[in-house]
Amino acid sequence: MKKVWLILPAFLGAITLFLLAVLLGKFSREEKIFQEQIPLNGLTYDEAFLKEAEKLPGIQSVTPVVPLAVHLSMEEYSMDAELFGVELTDLQYQAEQVSDTVLGRTPVLLIGKEALSALSDSNGHRISEKRLNQLLEGCQDLVLTASFQERPEQTFPCRVAAILKEPADRICFSIDQAKALAEQYGQSFSVKEILLTVKGETNFRKAKESVSAPHV
């Protein structure tokens, strides 16, 4: 009987600690800032949209994102890709490598470490992970050539500001540079997505559902 009485308090103590850890974990996630790039699905990014977004609990920012479809080339490799124009001061990212490239007229890209994995040579052979890593390690001197798919003969260079650990699958650059490129090459410049930043996991889930629900 003594053993039972000794085990019971220990068991209850373990349960209490477990529940406390769960509650603390939940609390910490409700204090965390969440961010995700979300398609507008038919919504129009305008003053009315922003006013409604401001009412969402925990909202930190709603940043416009403008995608530009391009063809990228690097050495003997090339691929179709999207460059996402966004206000870089609002973008949360983790950089693996950073160069000292200065923002100017030449587009300066933040490249996710997996965003160029679809690069292929003229025979259709996908670039190896080893070769891609070698190229990305020299991001300071890396130059990509880009063109809009409707005007393949009109190419322009892009420099690299950083290789990102997160977000790993996107190529981002300044929305001001995106606008300048669109105007220079006669491309559409429209907000198709947003960068949604919300405090708290529950608030973020609800805000994401509200914004990403299909609209007609």
What is each stretch, according to the model?
Residues 1-29:
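N-terminal Sec/SRP start-transfer signal
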Residues 64:
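Extended, charged/glycine-rich binding lobes that contact polyanionic ligands
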Residues 33, 49, 53-61, 69-76, ...:
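Basic-flanked hydrophobic alpha-helices used for secretion and membrane insertion
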Residues 26-49:
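Membrane-interface junction motifs in transport/secretion proteins
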